């Protein structure tokens, strides 16, 4: 719907996590379940980098298919409680179904475990109060949501956004190794090193 990137991440154990399920159209939803079924994956978590509707359109579908409730940072509780309102006010879409309740509100002390993998949670407020990076140190990968993009950063003019906070968050994530692959919520993949070299908003 809003050209948002959804990720299904698995390892050799076949356990997987679904990140930022913004699937709105039926073909998008079916593509996710087909990938999971074709690869005989076992979904363990449905996680969101933040509480905006474009990253959560598919939550009801995933809950119906796999029984997973979304997990999101606690600071985005307000946003998660009004996803249907967001759909109407931001995307002009009336959803004729209710979203599932949040299964767990996350903090920086939590980790996401599946298979042999562990994601740590880096709090990156600014685009929204509860924006996070999901960081896998073992694989040198970070899922950045709408905080960091190739040559750009997230907007801060939405409810709860803060330009000051996103700048503080960028200073933190700049400390990740240069070879960290960044998989954003929109657009193409990049890396910390590339963004430090090319992104005008980043500076160590």
Spell out what each predicted region is.
Residues 2-3, 73, 99, 128:
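Short, basic and Ser/Thr-rich N-terminal targeting/leader segments
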Residues 23-24, 87-89, 111, 117-204:
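Metallo-beta-lactamase
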Residues 18-20, 45-48, 121-123:
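Short catalytic-loop micro-motif centered on adjacent basic/acidic residues
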Residues 1-39, 133-145:
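Conserved beta-strand hairpin/beta-sheet module of binuclear metal-dependent hydrolase folds
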Residues 17, 47, 70, 143, ...:
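Residue-level marker for buried hydrophobic side chains located in beta-strands
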Residues 23-29, 33-112, 197-201:
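Active-site HxH/HxHxD metal-binding segment of metal-dependent hydrolases
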């Amino acid at each position: 719907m809003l050209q948002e990137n959804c990720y299904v991440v698995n390892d050799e154990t076949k356990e997987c996590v679904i990140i930022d399920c913004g699937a709105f159209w039926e073909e998008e939803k079916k593509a996710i379940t087909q990938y999971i079924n074709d690869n005989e994956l076992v979904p363990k978590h449905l996680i969101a980098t933040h509480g905006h509707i474009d990253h959560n359109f598919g939550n009801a579908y995933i809950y119906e298919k796999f029984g997973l409730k979304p997990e999101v940072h606690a600071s985005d509780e307000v946003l998660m409680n009004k996803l249907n309102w967001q759909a109407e006010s931001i995307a002009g879409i009336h959803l004729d179904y209710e979203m599932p309740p949040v299964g767990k509100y996350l903090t920086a002390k939590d980790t996401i475990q599946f298979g042999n993998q562990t994601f740590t949670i880096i709090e990156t407020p600014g685009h929204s109060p509860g924006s996070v990076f999901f960081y896998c140190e073992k694989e040198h990968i970070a899922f950045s949501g709408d905080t960091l993009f190739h040559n750009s950063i997230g907007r801060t003019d939405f409810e709860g956004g803060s330009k000051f906070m996103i700048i503080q968050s960028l200073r933190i994530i700049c400390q990740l190794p240069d070879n960290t692959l960044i998989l954003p919520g929109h657009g193409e993949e990049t890396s910390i090193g590339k963004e430090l070299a090319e992104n005008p908003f980043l500076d160590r």
